[in-house]
Swiss-Prot record:
GO terms for biological process: rRNA catabolic process; rRNA processing; tRNA processing. This is Ribonuclease PH. It comes from Pseudomonas fluorescens (strain ATCC BAA-477 / NRRL B-23932 / Pf-5). It catalyses: tRNA(n+1) + phosphate = tRNA(n) + a ribonucleoside 5'-diphosphate. It is an enzyme of class 2 (transferase). The lineage of its organism: Bacteria, Pseudomonadati, Pseudomonadota, Gammaproteobacteria, Pseudomonadales. Phosphate binds at residues 87, 125-127. The keyword RNA-binding applies. Belongs to the RNase PH family. InterPro entries: ExoRNase_PH_dom1, ExoRNase_PH_dom2, ExoRNase_PH_dom2_sf, PNPase/RNase_PH_dom_sf, Ribosomal_Su5_D2-typ_SF, RNase_PH, RNase_PH_bac-type, RNase_PH_CS. Pfam families: RNase_PH (PF01138), RNase_PH_C (PF03725). SUPFAM superfamilies: Ribonuclease PH domain 2-like, Ribosomal protein S5 domain 2-like. GO terms for molecular function: 3'-5'-RNA exonuclease activity; tRNA binding; tRNA nucleotidyltransferase activity.
């Protein structure tokens, strides 16, 4: 089996995490997984949604979108269509669920964190790149809240979160699929994990033939291996 990119089966794409990428947001990152590039920002606003009023905890919510020419052909803006598509809604809910798992909301205080992930160039794995980059932006946003005198109850950060794709490509498990691999893969899996080794989400779909338990285990093992590298890259970015 030869991957289109020439990478080994267990090799991640080149990953770069650039912090403080925009000027105004409390946390901002440009994350690059190969040719996939996503701007992730975290904005802090006082107050919480109505359903959390008086409960003594904060909230985090996420939005996701793609520039019209992030892909090979121009896509119409969802705003001009008047509604978000099902894929967009699914991905932004995934991002929100994943990042909430990083936090103890009771220590966040009466604030809402708005995570915005905007894909400026797509070559596969946009949702996993979004989660990985937004996690770093979230850490920076928490530092800003603390500097402003918040987080009196202690550090709300419980653990780091990251995500990666794995799949069965030409009968073999491969790590971090790009678009060419993703479009031809027999199975595509998106895996979200904590830095302590737990799974937050595993999204898997077979195209054509179903995948077998042994293949699932092989893909999850590959995801765990890749995730260890990604967590190291997150920590290195935060150390700069």
């Amino acid at each position: 089996m030869k991957r289109p990119s020439g990478r080994a089966a267990d090799q991640l794409r080149s990953i770069r995490i650039t912090r403080n990428y925009t000027k105004h947001a409390e946390g901002s990152v440009l994350v690059e997984f190969g040719d996939t590039k996503v701007i992730c920002t975290v904005s802090v606003e006082n107050g919480v949604p109505r359903f959390l009023k008086g409960q003594g905890q904060g909230w985090l919510t996420a939005e996701y979108g793609m520039l019209p020419r992030a892909t090979g052909e121009r896509n119409q803006r969802e705003a001009s269509r008047g509604k978000q598509g099902g894929r967009t809604l699914e991905i932004q809910r995934l991002i929100g669920r994943s990042l909430r798992a990083a936090l103890d909301m009771s220590k966040l205080g009466d604030v809402t964190l708005y995570v915005d992930c905007d894909v400026i160039q797509a070559d596969g794995g946009t949702r996993t790149a979004s989660i990985t980059g937004a996690m770093v932006a979230l850490v920076d946003a928490l530092k800003v809240i603390k500097k402003r005198g918040g987080l009196k109850g202690g550090d709300p950060l419980k653990q780091m979160i990251a995500a990666v794709s794995v799949g069965m490509y030409q009968g073999e498990p491969v790590l971090d699929l790009d678009y060419l691999e993703d479009s031809a893969a027999e199975t595509d899996l998106n895996v979200v994990m904590t830095s302590t080794g737990g799974f937050i989400e595993v999204q898997g779909t077979a195209e054509g033939a179903p995948f077998q338990p042994a293949e699932l285990n092989a893909m999850l093992a590959l995801a765990q291996q890749g995730m260890n590298e990604i967590f190291q890259l997150q920590q290195a970015a935060l150390a700069d």
